Amino acid sequence: MRPAGRSVQQVRPVTITRHFTRHAEGSVLIAFGDTRVLCTASVEEGVPRFLKGQGQGWITAEYGMLPRATHTRNPREAAKGKQGGRTLEIQRLIARSLRAAVDLTKLGEYTITLDCDVIQADGGTRTASITGACVALADALSSMQKKGQLKTNPMKGFVAAISVGIVAGEAVCDLEYVEDSAAETDMNVVMMEDGRMIEVQGTAEGEPFSQQELNTLLELARGGIDSLVQAQKAALVGA
């Protein structure tokens, strides 16, 4: 039996709290069960040098964990003087995923930075970051419209992400830490709301997985992402 008695396809309770901080154009606290991530979207005029003069915008991301987001304290990466490989991988994933949600040619020469800070980690921090950052991004784009910085909203659709895996021989959706640490196969899936895939990261930690198991995992991911998109849209009602 899974922790908390969840079924194989059941995601953890998800809450999305908008306008969590005052200053950012978009700000969301998202919870996937006991995993909590603060996601902010900040708008700045200008784009990276390689895009100057092209009339299009850019979306980038930064990711980090508070020192005591985990069971034992991890020193801040700033104190070490450099970011770790995992951090760099995750923030690039977040940025790639959210760029897929926006028509950058309609953004104008603005850069939106998505900052995802893990307050508490219990598995799925990158998937929670992407899902929460999408809502923060939606709020930032709405803010830009209200300020007259955008004529139309360039958002093409919602993006969400979920983890799936094989634990004790069974395919399950939305792994928490105890499941993730024991998984034979671990996979993160990022999708548009219409089911088109943005990224699939899958690794066999133990036994290799079959094509049939891969299909089962992707079906579980689609169901989980559908429920996350519903939560995103519900959070934005009345935006």
From Swiss-Prot:
Which keywords fit this entry according to its UniProt record? Nucleotidyltransferase, RNA-binding, rRNA processing, Transferase, tRNA processing, tRNA-binding
What is this enzyme's catalytic activity, as reactions? tRNA(n+1) + phosphate = tRNA(n) + a ribonucleoside 5'-diphosphate
Name the residues that bind phosphate.
86, 124-126
Q: Which GO terms of the molecular function aspect are on file?
A: 3'-5'-RNA exonuclease activity; tRNA binding; tRNA nucleotidyltransferase activity
Top-tier EC class: transferase
CDD domains named among the record's database cross-references: RNase_PH_bact
The record's Gene Ontology biological-process terms are: rRNA catabolic process; rRNA processing; tRNA processing
Q: What are the TM regions of this chain, as residue ranges?
A: none
Domain of life, source organism: Bacteria
Which InterPro entries has this protein been placed in? ExoRNase_PH_dom1, ExoRNase_PH_dom2, ExoRNase_PH_dom2_sf, PNPase/RNase_PH_dom_sf, Ribosomal_Su5_D2-typ_SF, RNase_PH, RNase_PH_bac-type, RNase_PH_CS
Give the E.C. number(s): 2.7.7.56
Its subunit composition reads:
Homohexameric ring arranged as a trimer of dimers.
Annotated function:
Phosphorolytic 3'-5' exoribonuclease that plays an important role in tRNA 3'-end maturation. Removes nucleotide residues following the 3'-CCA terminus of tRNAs; can also add nucleotides to the ends of RNA molecules by using nucleoside diphosphates as substrates, but this may not be physiologically important. Probably plays a role in initiation of 16S rRNA degradation (leading to ribosome degradation) during starvation.
Q: Entry's HAMAP family?
A: RNase_PH (MF_00564)
Task: Quote the NCBIfam families the UniProt record gives.
Answer: RNasePH
Give the similarity note.
Belongs to the RNase PH family.
Mind telling me what this protein is named? Answer: Ribonuclease PH
